[in-house]
Amino acid sequence: LKAKGYTTCHTGKWHLNGFFNDPRHPQPNDHGYDWWLATQNNASPHHINPKNFVRNGKAVGVIEGASAVIAAQEAAHWLRKERDKDKPFFITVWTHEPHLPIESAPEFMKPYADIDDEGIRQHHGNITQLDHAFGLLMKELDEQGLAEDTFVFFTSDNGPEGAGTKGRTRGSTGGLRGRKRWSHEGGIRVPGIARWPGHIKPGSINSDLVSNLDFAQTFLELAGVDSPPDMQGLSLVPLLAGKTPADWRTSLFDQYCEFPGPDGVRRHMGVRDSLYKLMHFYNLDEWVLYGLERDPREMHSVYG
C-alpha cells in the first residue's frame, strides 16, 4: 500500500510481537504505519484510563477515557490533522473491547441498569462502549466528506473469551457451541460487516465461506495492488459485489494446538464445508462430525 502512495495509521491493540516498543522486534512503523497509537495485547490495567499506550514509539502515560474511544478518537484526529490529504489512506483500529479484563464507563452501562448481575452490566456496557467508538469514526468520515469513497469493514478475530457462564465473561455466540480457541461455530463464526457505498447493496447477506486470511487480498485489490504470490487468502471483492466466483472455496480448515491452555481446550483441528464439520482431538484420537444444517449448535455427533 505504501508503494501505491497510501498514508497509513494504526490505533488500539498491537499483538504482533513479544517485545513491544523494543527494537528487538518489529513495531507498527516497521510494518508500514506512518502513525500509530497502540498497546501490546490488553489495555492496562483495564479498558478505563489505560496507562500503557505508546504513540509513535513514545509512551504517553495515563489517558483518561475508554480504550476503544481513545483508539477511535486518535484515528479521527489523524484523519483531520496528521495525514497527507493528497494521498489515499488506510486505517486499522483494533479495539481491546470486549476482550477480558472488561471494564466499562458508567455512561455505557446505563442502558442495562435493570440487570441485577453487575458483571453482565459491565459486559453489555463494553459492547456499547465499542459501538460508540465505532460510531465516532463513522461520524468523522461523514464530516470530512469521505464516507462515499471509503471502504469500511468491521469484524472480530474469534468468539467470546472466558467460560461464558456468568458476569463479565458472558459473551454471546448466538446460541452456537464453543468460544475462543474452539473450532465449534461459536469460536470461529464472527461478525463481518462491510460498507462500500455504490458497490455493496445495503442489507445484503453473503453465506460463502470466508477467512481472515482473505482480508489482505481484499484491501490490496481495492487499492489496485497485486497480491504477493505466497498469500493464502482470496479477495472478497467479488462477493461484496454479489458475484461469487464459480471456483470459490468450498471448505475451511483450522487448528488449535496449545494445551494445557486457557479454559482447558484440548488440541484439535477442524474442517468444514457448507453442510458438515469434522473435528479431530488428536491427543485423544477422538473424532466428531456434525451436520450443520440440522444441528447448527453441534450438539449431536454423527461420526461413525
At which residue positions do the language-model features occur?
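Formylglycine-dependent
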Residues: K2-Y6, H15-I91, T95-A113, R121-H124, ...
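Catalytic metal-binding/acid-base residues of hydrolase active sites
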Residues: K13-H15, H96, G159, H199
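C-terminal cap/loop subdomain of S1 sulfatases and analogous C-terminal strand-loop tails that border
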Residues: D22, P26-W35, Q40, P160-E185, ...
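Structural scaffold positions in well-ordered secondary structure
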Residues: L1, K13, F134, V152-F154, ...
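Stable alpha-helical elements in mature extracytoplasmic
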Residues: K4, N29, S67, A71, ...
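Loop/turn elements at helix/coil->beta-strand transitions in domains of secreted/extracellular proteins
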Residues: K4-C9, H31-D34, D84-I91, L146-V152, ...
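Metal-dependent active-site segment of extracytoplasmic phospho-/sulfohydrolases and closely related
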Residues: P88, W94, Q129-R168
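Non-transmembrane alpha-helical segments in soluble domains
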Residues: K2, D34-L37, A76-R80, H124, ...
